[in-house]
């Protein structure tokens, strides 16, 4: 059986370089291009890439995906900064390339994805819930895409269950003291030297609390999810948001 031809965009970054090694080590994949800033996107078509792993920046991702979709190249995207407007534009491009698949994953760690699903399942049973994400100080966005996605899943689960608004008697606070409000769920971001990527979901009810925590200790923790995404996206046309849809959790 022929190998799937894969390219990595953002190949010189920490996660990108790890992804290059992971693709090279996979028996069923062939690394055909490893592109960094300034490299020609035409290399993707020159090398016959069938799928890309997109790990660049919010400033570059739309141009890269536009090129990929115009040439029928599937994409697994870890780049953050997604807005409703950007997603709408991406769906417009996908309408013109209906057989092409795009996976956008706020987190490629399977443990982190499971943490999100556990929190979603638990949220309806507790009166209060808050999210704390902890990352290295070089991370440019806050809160993280994972924390935002977690809060959105929690909020949707609570709305479906008819949960009351969370109790909070705070009337005065310094700016940011109660975190960011994501659909009614407080999200707190910590940036600290020595950390990589960590998240806690704190749930509280009458006389008890539950803490759901995940820790990524090395960039290698993202590789099984990236490889799963590459293998599944080529048979999943359209936009898939969240790696959980490829884990058959339901």
UniProtKB/Swiss-Prot annotation:
**Positions bound to NAD(+):** 10-15, 78-80, 105-108
Pathway the protein takes part in:
Amino-acid biosynthesis; L-lysine biosynthesis via DAP pathway; (S)-tetrahydrodipicolinate from L-aspartate: step 4/4
Question: So which domain of life are we looking at?
Answer: Bacteria
Q: Where in the cell is it found?
A: Cytoplasm
Enumerate the catalysed reactions: (S)-2,3,4,5-tetrahydrodipicolinate + NAD(+) + H2O = (2S,4S)-4-hydroxy-2,3,4,5-tetrahydrodipicolinate + NADH + H(+); (S)-2,3,4,5-tetrahydrodipicolinate + NADP(+) + H2O = (2S,4S)-4-hydroxy-2,3,4,5-tetrahydrodipicolinate + NADPH + H(+)
Catalytic residues (UniProt)? 135 (proton donor/acceptor), 139 (proton donor)
State the UniProt keywords alphabetically.
Answer: Amino-acid biosynthesis, Cytoplasm, Diaminopimelate biosynthesis, Lysine biosynthesis, NAD, NADP, Oxidoreductase
Protein name, entry field: 4-hydroxy-tetrahydrodipicolinate reductase
Q: Which organism is it from?
A: Streptomyces griseus subsp. griseus (strain JCM 4626 / CBS 651.72 / NBRC 13350 / KCC S-0626 / ISP 5235)
Q: Which gene encodes it?
A: dapB
């Amino acid at each position: 059986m022929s190998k799937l031809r894969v390219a990595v965009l953002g190949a010189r970054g920490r996660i990108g370089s790890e992804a290059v090694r992971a693709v090279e080590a996979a028996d069923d994949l062939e690394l055909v291009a490893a592109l960094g800033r300034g490299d020609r996107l035409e290399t993707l078509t020159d090398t016959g890439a069938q799928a890309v792993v997109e790990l660049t920046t919010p400033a570059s991702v739309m141009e890269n995906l536009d090129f990929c979709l115009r040439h029928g190249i599937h994409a697994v995207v870890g780049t953050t900064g997604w807005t409703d407007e950007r997603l709408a534009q991406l769906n417009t491009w996908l309408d013109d390339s209906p057989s092409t698949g795009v996976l956008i994953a706020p987190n490629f760690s399977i443990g982190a994805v499971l943490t999100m699903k556990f929190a979603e399942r638990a949220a309806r049973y507790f009166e209060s819930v808050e999210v704390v994400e902890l990352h290295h100080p070089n991370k440019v966005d806050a809160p993280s895409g994972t924390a935002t996605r977690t809060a959105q899943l929690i909020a949707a689960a609570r709305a479906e269950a008819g949960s009351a608004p969370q109790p909070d008697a705070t009337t005065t606070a310094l700016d940011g003291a109660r975190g960011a409000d994501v659909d009614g769920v407080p999200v707190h971001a910590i940036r600290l030297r020595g950390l990589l990527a960590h998240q806690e979901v704190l749930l509280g009810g009458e006389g008890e609390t539950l803490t759901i925590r995940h820790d990524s200790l090395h960039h290698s923790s993202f590789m099984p999810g990236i490889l799963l995404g590459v293998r599944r996206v080529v048979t999943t046309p359209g936009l898939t948001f969240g790696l959980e849809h490829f884990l058959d959790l339901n």
